Amino acid sequence: MTKLPQTQGVLNFIQKYLYNSTNYNFEDGSTQAINVPYPDSGVYENYILHYPDATSTELLDINIDQLYSEVMVLTDPKIERAYEYILEERDPGTSSTNILVTVGVDDIAAFDGSASSYMHQLQQKYNFRSIVVSIGPNPNYLEVLAESPDWYFTATDSNGKWVAEQISRIICHL
């Protein structure tokens, strides 16, 4: 099994842009985040942080590097596995605002209803809201998982920072 080349695009977006907004405050716990790889997210139990373990962007970066180097062998990723894992294994607690930011490449399985079903369950149980980022210039199937068309983004090397800023604005205005 080998890593898909697109995986590097996902990692680059997350590490360079997604968590690096000055609007987030990990230190005092008002911003909490975890990284959940897919597929088979449960296999990575020992490597996935709990809320609110990530008290800085540095810890999130270390966690991403660890996931990538030790466990992320992705050949046929299905986003629904990450949603299922969060639903069953990672209670966000009493947070008033829960945002799920999905960053991925093409996942035709998003159309089969499984990912949408888990997303709906996360919305019902924990009031999650869904922002989706597709990596690469090609259209893909992930848009169906976004809460609205305005919450779906396509990120490339040239617009990654802008996409991350838009996500930060959405989150900070909820």
Swiss-Prot record:
This is Uncharacterized protein C18H9.6. It comes from Caenorhabditis elegans.
